[in-house]
């Protein structure tokens, strides 16, 4: 059993999807030339750690990438950032993309108040050589019809894309479709690749995909 699988098991809160992946995936070495890189995101597996602890875990358990803990890097000076990046490079570990640091599914006021935070995150992530952001699209909504929800997503994600693009970064969108989510609320929303493509076309920004 590889170090990475031992780590996931020891956390006791890893998702079934991670645990059930083929053993051969976990036996791959971090420094191989495979195109798919395995990233350690502490939030995804339910652990709390500092940026330094996250990097040590990635080194110990042979992960290829780590999620940037932006709040910590905001408080670092350039010398500290350079030292962190050097340690990553020595161990052939890169940063994964970042999640959006704002609420775009709730009220307009909450969304607007988060735009400044997004801009500040972009500045920090540029120092870390992070390539962009990613967020997921929920497949249902309990209050908004498909068209109303589509228009809100188009307008708000376009604003996000412009800020992200101004910093030379990309913005990835993901649809999710487990049955538990698809049947949760009253109104259906994006749940297929074709529908997601329509949203990307409507946003109409070159850095969105």
Model-derived regions: residue spans:
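Alpha-helical membrane-embedding segments
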Residues: 152-153, 183
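Short, small-residue-enriched loops and turns at beta-alpha junctions
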Residues: 73-75, 104-106, 140-142, 178-185
């Amino acid at each position: 059993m590889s170090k990475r699988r031992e780590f996931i098991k020891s956390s006791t809160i890893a998702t079934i999807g991670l645990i059930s992946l083929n053993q051969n995936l976990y036996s791959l070495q971090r420094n191989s030339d495979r195109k798919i890189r395995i990233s350690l995101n502490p939030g995804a597996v339910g652990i709390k750690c500092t940026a330094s602890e996250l990097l040590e875990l990635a080194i110990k358990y042979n992960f290829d990438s780590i999620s940037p803990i932006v709040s910590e890097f905001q408080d670092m000076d350039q010398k500290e950032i350079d030292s962190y990046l050097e340690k990553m490079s020595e161990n052939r570990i890169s940063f994964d993309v970042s999640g959006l640091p704002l609420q775009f599914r709730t009220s307009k006021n909450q969304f607007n108040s988060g735009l400044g935070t997004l801009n500040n995150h972009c500045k920090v992530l540029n120092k870390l050589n992070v390539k962009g952001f990613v967020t997921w699209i929920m497949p249902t909504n309990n209050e908004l019809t498909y068209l109303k929800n589509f228009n809100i997503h188009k307008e708000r994600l376009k604003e996000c894309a412009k800020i992200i693009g101004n910093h030379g970064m990309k913005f990835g969108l993901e649809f999710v479709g487990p049955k538990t989510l698809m049947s949760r609320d009253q109104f259906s929303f994006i749940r297929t690749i074709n529908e997601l493509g329509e949203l990307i076309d409507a946003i109409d920004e070159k850095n969105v995909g």
